[in-house]
Amino acid sequence: MSRLPALATAAVLAIAPTSYAAPAAAPPPAAKPPPISVAAAPIFGQDAPVGSGWYDVLVRVDNPQATAQKGVLELRVSQPWDNERPFVSRAPYNVPAGKTAYVRLLAHSLPEGGSGEVHVKARDDKGAELLDVPVPVNTADLPVLVDVHEPSRLSVALRGWPASIRYSPTPTAWGYGSTPGIGFAAPSFDRATGDPLLPERKAGYGGVAAVLMPTDVLTRLQGDALDALVSWVAGGGTLALVPMRPEDLRNPTVAALAGGEPHPIPTPPALLALPTIPRPSGTGITVPPVIEPEDEGIGFEGETGASFQLLPTAPAHGRRGPFLPISTSRRGGSLGPRPATVAKMSGYEGGSLVQTAHGATSTYGLGEVVFLSYDPSQAPGVDDPWVQGRVASLVEHAWERRANIAFPPGSIPKHSWRTDEMRRSLDPNENFRPGLGFAAIVLAIYSVVVGPITFMRSRKKGDPLLPLRWAPVWSAAAFGAIVIAGLAVKGWTGRSRRMSLVEIGAGFTRGTIRRYRGFFTSETRALKVGATDAASVLDVVTGDGVLRPRSSLAVDRDGVALDEITSLPWQTLVVREDGHVDLPGSIAVLDTGGSGIDVVNHTGKVLKDVVVYVPGDAAHYFAAIPDGGTVSAASGTVLFTSATRRAGSAGSRIVHTLDVTTLASPVLDEVTRDRMEATWRPVESAADESVDWWPDDAPVVLAELDGADHPRTDSGLRVESDKVLLRVVGYGGAR
């Protein structure tokens, strides 16, 4: 009987696993949530096309903690198959407890690689990664309108409107027979102040054709946001203003953009007679025939019984015309705006404003400022098909004007090979040919001396060991001569070379500038390349002279800088910089009637190797124009005529290439031809083939600014040369 309890215990233990489960292991502690939250998107919205250049990514950092949070935001653009050469930009953040902060990060598309994968990482002040947020980006090249209204009601009517355009920066981008739609974008607004969150560098507008803004918002802008917008307009952008209050017209910024204080007038009858532009089906709109400015004011009867009058389409780079026949009446009723829209319309004049088919328009630098006679942001204008068509036409016109600019703000080359000529012009190694020739001569002499001559002496003296004694001497002498020649040509220390192109409107002092900065070092060296000013952006053009392909763009209050660059000895690193520049004076281009043009130099410097192109006539060469000097185009040496310009295509639009072979015309002496070709060939190669260097409707002045001020050092290296070139477009200025 004593064994029964033991057997019972054994039986219980045997079945225990099926009737009893041990307590489950405690779950691992949940990961600690990050102390901040991050949201990132392109500054004009995640659906807005940013084009194939620079753009801003707006990052909102929310801090729900009871203590301030600070660290670094890092944006990375890379391709899955080529993660060794990403684009990286960084900016610090510091968010007080319970607050929200907005941080702008710079980005650009990858040459020959599209948008790539864009991510924003947040790190704390110790470098630990907190968050990794993907950023959707649309890099389509489209005519984009940014509507700075809150909310934007025009987007419903205009988004995807088939654009009737001819110009394309990439001729095959839209296929055969297809038509791109107008891209629509709108900025975010600061929840605390109600102000729009706009780019603080003009490169942030790289993918934008036109900006629509009420004047009460413009008058509130200040600091970097205002400077970026104005610089973008001066560089070729189009700003459409909706006057909201009488006092806005007296604002200094508004007056400066209009060339003087504007004031309201009755709506021009010709504007009211403009026909309604129906929404295209995708095949485009037929443009009426162009009539010369001399015919302004005439009226005539069309074949269909419609009566017409003439209205200029645009200021045409500071000059009125060409003019467009406008239908004023047609059997079946008016084609103008609705009566409710007309009742609220007003015209404007004053300053340099000219009445055009888009509104009262002034030229500002290379860009345009349009004072709209209607308000497209609210009823009745926003619901009027006539208003919708006018705005669409304005965006299309703004897009077409981009063809006249060699380096539009925020643009980057479509192909990396385009900068090869620029790299060669900035590379001291390209000047090593004399050194190579000297080395070849030294080696030839060495081979003769150490060979036949030394052995002949040995035979004459009967000393068979003489070559063994003298050969090392001749070898050391030849080696030393070659090394000294190499050091003499390449230099004992590093140095920098620079080349810039300033594009500017006639009569204006602010223009857009594209700088190429070459850095040549004699040793492995860590470089930090800072921007010339806080409004410029930087990027590495060629990495042949870099030990590591990775570099990052650091953004702070003082501007941007490329860091983490380690250069290789005797190699050249080239950096591209985009910004704006204010010249000490302007270059005036004055219409003297017919095909006559006078050019007046107010820059304070001598203009060297000047080319003055007169539309419909020819390009004329002048060796120099002194400060304060005036030349008449007809008195120069003819390089080529308008009929002999080299033509190309950009989409379905005809453009005219720079073609340095025509600048280096046989009518010039050989030294001048070589200098002109060496100066302008790198610029021609760096610009896309879609540039209309010699427009049909605007004069162009090309020149080198002789004696331009430049820094003595660049990123710690001596500046060996700094060439500043000018391209002046349009009419304007004073004697």
Where are these regions (language model features)?
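Bacterial N-terminal signal peptides
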Residues: 8-19
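A conserved amphipathic helix/loop scaffold
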Residues: 27-30, 37-41, 130, 146-206, ...
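Extracellular ligand-binding/catalytic regions of CAZymes and related secreted enzymes
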Residues: 22-81, 89-106, 110-112, 118, ...
